[in-house]
């Protein structure tokens, strides 16, 4: 039976485009890594906010009936920056 690995990456290992590229190399270096679970990007620097924490904040604000558009835009911006820095154009 062919060995198959499930691997999970997230947090600082997916914090920015540079880290995404490192993760891609890790995955491609081992053909048994066939299933990849990606969680939310973490901090890029000490004062940064983890995406998970931003998502919790959106939930908290929504639960209290507050407008969370600005908070959600920060999450979208984080992912869009990663996409742009990876040079992905057709998204």
Which functions belong to the PLM regions below?
Residues 1-91:
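Nucleotide/pyrophosphate-binding catalytic subdomain
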């Amino acid at each position: 039976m062919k060995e198959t690995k499930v691997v999970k990456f997230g947090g600082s290992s997916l914090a920015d485009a540079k880290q995404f590229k490192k993760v891609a190399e890790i995955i491609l270096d081992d053909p048994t890594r066939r299933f990849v679970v990606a969680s939310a990007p973490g901090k890029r620097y000490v004062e940064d906010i983890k995406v998970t924490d931003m998502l919790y904040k959106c939930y908290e604000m929504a639960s209290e009936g507050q407008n969370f558009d600005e908070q959600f835009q920060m999450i979208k911006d984080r992912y869009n920056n990663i996409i742009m820095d990876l040079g992905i154009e057709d998204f």
